[in-house]
């Protein structure tokens, strides 16, 4: 396979951030909070259309409306998703093919919310950018590295704003404050994990095709598949269960590392890994689906924040950091477990139900989190850049720095997008494309490693390819199927 030809986009991006963090504006570190934008767009609301309006798409659309958007049209391949919106907005225009919506109503809206499965994020987003629309797209940004690069290239060419939906991103200001205060000391290790998957994974073969639901339009399933392979309609794919399949989702790491590891990537300008290695705990390479549980180690090159480089360890499927190997974690886990039991007792009492506490409460590490181990302090935080706490080191210094970060974090994830679109400023959003693309790419490189458990894959960020496994490079490429070819966009 030929080397991926993404270097011009990547080089221009790397130049813009000063080679991994020497000027961190492009990573969002020095972004002004929302107050800096006030007064520029008073009274102006953004007109949007929703593509994928159930599940996360529904939640994101409602949040965008609350943040200053007017919803003018909705689109979903599954018409059963329309009922909710019809009750709220009687007579709102409805479509089952976003391309028909663009053609019929493209002059009626300025931006789109893309809340479809992972494998169609990039194609729909690029098509909409080419049609002049700003894009709010769910996480992960795309399913392959090439798709992320194509999105970045299209945004720069069309000057359309793109924001990725990692909704907890405003919380990274706390981590910036911790970094700037120097309370961690030198960063030694980073751990991030999730209790996902909560959907099927580990399948050995594709699902047996079922009849397409009678309420679907004739081309609805084709639209659902988009550029990815059509394995026939099945309830094992639609709805929700698509996440566990290689061709349609990004597994647990794609679903949750975008949230849980976000503060580490942003705060330390990690960029792309130089080496990745995965462990699937004896499951071996799975042909059609992600493994049930995994551990992925990612090595990142040195920069001004991590002068000796760093290893980030991601785990999922119930695999959590070892309590005994991280200072302070076992004591924290004991307190967390006790608090969980107290919460259960309170909930039972409120419901008027009896509650019998266990004879012994074992230490419990939360289901999702991020641990940053430094020479001076260690912190643990929850999902979506949740409030970190000190588990080892100077707790007062950590608390003071976090309070400073809280004071700086005054903006809304969704309002940022609205104001960026109205100002036509690609860099106003915290989770803007120049940050979201490399973040997602790093995780997708980890996804590829899951196909080669036990093998250390070296990644060349300049050439955007694996340097020691040519076959693995095929999984970095964007798919194409019939008319759904990125080359036509």
Which residues does each PLM region occupy?
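C-terminal helix-rich "cap/oligomerization" subdomain common to oxidoreductases
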Residues: 15-42, 289, 420-489
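Hydrophobic residues in well-ordered beta-strands that form the structural core
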Residues: 50, 114, 137, 162-164, ...
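Beta-loop-alpha module in the N-terminal Rossmann-like domain of NAD(P)-dependent dehydrogenases
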Residues: 92-150
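Glycine-rich, aromatic-lined ligand/substrate-binding cores of catalytic
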Residues: 217-415, 419-425, 429, 439-448, ...
């Amino acid at each position: 396979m030929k080397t991926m030809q993404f270097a011009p986009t990547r080089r221009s991006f790397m130049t813009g951030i000063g080679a991994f963090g020497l000027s961190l504006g492009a990573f969002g570190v020095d972004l002004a909070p929302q107050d800096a934008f006030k007064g520029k767009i008073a009274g102006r609301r953004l007109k949007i259309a929703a593509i994928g309006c159930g599940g996360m798409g529904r939640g994101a659309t409602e949040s965008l409306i609350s943040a200053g958007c007017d919803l003018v049209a909705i689109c979903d391949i599954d018409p059963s998703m329309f009922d909710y919106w019809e009750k709220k907005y009687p007579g709102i225009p409805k479509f089952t093919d976003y391309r028909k919506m663009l053609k019929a109503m493209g002059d009626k809206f300025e931006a789109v919310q893309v809340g479809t499965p992972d494998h169609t994020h990039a194609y729909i987003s690029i098509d909409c950018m080419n049609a002049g629309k700003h894009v709010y797209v769910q996480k992960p940004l795309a399913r392959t590295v090439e798709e992320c690069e194509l999105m970045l290239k299209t945004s720069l060419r069309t000057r359309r704003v793109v924001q990725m939906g990692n909704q907890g991103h405003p919380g990274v200001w706390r981590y910036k404050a911790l970094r700037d205060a120097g309370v961690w000391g030198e960063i030694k290790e980073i751990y991030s994990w999730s209790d996902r998957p909560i959907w099927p994974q580990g399948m050995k073969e594709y699902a047996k095709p079922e009849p397409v639901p009678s309420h679907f339009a004739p081309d609805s399933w084709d639209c659902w598949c988009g550029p990815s392979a059509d394995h026939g309609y099945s309830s094992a794919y639609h709805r929700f269960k698509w996440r566990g399949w290689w061709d349609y989702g990004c597994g647990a790491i794609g679903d949750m590392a975008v949230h849980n590891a976000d503060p580490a990537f942003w705060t330390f300008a990690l960029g792309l890994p130089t080496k990745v290695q995965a462990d699937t705990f004896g499951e071996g390479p799975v042909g059609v689906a992600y493994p049930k549980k995994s551990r992925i180690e990612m090595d990142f090159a040195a920069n001004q924040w991590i002068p000796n480089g760093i290893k980030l360890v991601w785990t999922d499927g119930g695999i959590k950091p070892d309590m005994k190997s991280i200072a302070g974690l076992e004591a924290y886990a004991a307190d967390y477990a006790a608090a969980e039991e107290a919460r259960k007792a309170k909930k039972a009492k409120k419901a008027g139900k009896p509650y019998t506490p266990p004879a012994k409460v074992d230490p419990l590490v939360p289901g999702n989190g991020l641990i940053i181990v430094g020479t001076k302090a260690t912190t643990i935080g929850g999902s979506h850049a949740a409030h970190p706490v000190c588990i080892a080191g100077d707790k007062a210094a950590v608390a003071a720095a976090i309070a400073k970060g809280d004071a700086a974090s005054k903006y809304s994830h969704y309002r940022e997008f609205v104001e960026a679109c109205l100002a036509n400023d690609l860099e106003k959003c915290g989770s803007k494309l120049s940050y979201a693309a490399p973040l997602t790419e790093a995780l997708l490189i980890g996804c590829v490693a899951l196909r080669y458990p036990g093998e250390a894959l070296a990644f060349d960020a300049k050439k955007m390819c694996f340097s020691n496994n040519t076959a693995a490079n095929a999984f970095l490429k964007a798919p194409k199927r019939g008319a759904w070819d990125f080359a036509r966009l």
